[in-house]
Amino acid sequence: FDNTTLSVVDSLKATDKNFVILMDSLDDFQLDIESVSNSMMGLLKFVGSMNKPRDVVDIRFCLPTELYRRIIKISSNPNKDFRRSLKLQWTATELILIGAQRLKIYLELYYPDFLHGLGPLDPTGRSDALKLFGAVLPKTITNHAGFQEETISYILRHTQLLPRHFLMLLNSIFRSNGGTQSLNPFPVSEARILNGIRQVEERIVTEIFVAFKLIYPTAEEVCKRCIPELGHKFSVGELHRVYTRRGKAVF
């Protein structure tokens, strides 16, 4: 093992490259259990102490943003354990670029003639990515409130700006295609977009509640009680009144 490690490090140094190891986060952090909390404290100390700026091998432990403040409190020395921490946050543009690359592969497989007719496109560039989406989606869509909205904005609005959410929605929209290349189903109909989102949005909402369950265990029930009582727009005062009347009963 030692020889292998030295060989890898020497190779990375020779090519002036760094190797990053990402330890993915758990799905369920049971931090209210003392043994789990103590284990997490030790893990944070270990990861925080072993990485140095000049190391060619960088080990990164991924933590969900929703639990960041809770985990900071577990750390025995946050200044040391988190001195090289990075917050990863996706933007709408980045999601569009990721989605466009997937979309291009889809078109190459099932609608190559249609894709060829669009001319050369680079889905890693913002302009071409938007052009690709503009070719397969209607420019606007009528939302459930009866207002016109840009289609790509409408789809993104149903995500937490996470790639997996955006890809889940796109997969759902394009999955029920049922057509052939000769039928040319583009732009996708408004009904298919609305139906595709409807089939996935509940799973996304459930995922969000699960992510916050450790910190806000009653959030889902409070939302079920309060949201039906609120309009599309409401003041802080209205929210407070509805919460006092309906939400507090959960506790």
For every predicted segment, state its role.
Residues T4-S11, T15-V20, S25-H144, E190-N195, ...:
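The catalytic "switch" region of P-loop NTPases
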Residues A14, T151-S153:
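Short hydrophobic "helix-edge" motifs at membrane interfaces and signal-peptide entry regions
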